[in-house]
A protein has these predicted regions:
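Extracytoplasmic metal-acquisition and chelation regions
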Residues: 1-191
Length: 191
């Protein structure tokens, strides 16, 4: 299922971050398998075996992340990031998602956005906010300072991979490893 979002100019469009819902990623994998099987029918069975094995790994990943998310106390299941990339992840795993910016990392971060989100964090007693690998840290650090100015502390819970995979150094060089790493980072900070 594709999620709607409102752009800054009020136009409704679809959230492009489909990969954060494992069910969507399974559909993408199916399209790749079918395309390869059609383009190279001599190896269709090989592609089918790999596709089936990958689906099993995706199902295991989905179950792992759901179990991790359920270990977070319900009142703490709020994911605050720099830009609005995690709506599919939140929808799939039961997290409320808040962001300083919209879906595009090109949009400007306004002081009103930071102030409103700081008020939300204080009111809900949110434990952690998250930086992203593909977005400069300055907006999250500004949010952290805005919360501090209101007499509360909020920690930076770690770095999430939003618009790119990580690398072998961080054990995030594949889709599955990245999804699990994001889940672990979120859970460790919000528990």
């Amino acid at each position: 299922t594709l999620l709607d979002f409102d752009e800054e100019d009020g136009v409704k469009t679809k959230d492009p971050h489909i990969w954060f819902d494992v069910a969507n990623w399974k559909l993408a994998a199916k399209a790749v398998y079918e395309g390869l099987a059609k383009a190279d029918p001599a190896h269709k069975e090989d592609y089918k075996k790999r596709y089936d094995a990958y689906l099993t790994k995706l199902d295991e990943t989905d179950a792992y992340v759901k179990a991790q998310a359920e270990s977070i106390p319900k009142e703490s299941r709020v994911l605050v990031t720099a830009h609005d990339a995690f709506n599919y992840f939140g929808e799939q795993f039961g997290l409320e998602v808040k962001a300083i910016q919209g879906v595009s990392t090109d949009s400007e971060t306004g002081t009103k956005n930071i102030s409103d989100l700081a008020n939300f964090i204080v009111q809900r007693n949110i434990k952690a906010i998250f930086v992203e690998s593909s977005v400069p840290k300055k907006s999250i650090e500004a949010l952290q300072e805005a919360v501090k100015a209101k007499g509360k502390e909020v920690k930076i819970g770690g770095e999430l991979y939003s618009d790119s995979l990580g690398d072998e150094t961080h054990n995030t060089e594949t889709y599955i490893k990245t999804v699990k790493a994001n889940a672990d980072t979120i859970v460790n900070a919000l528990k």
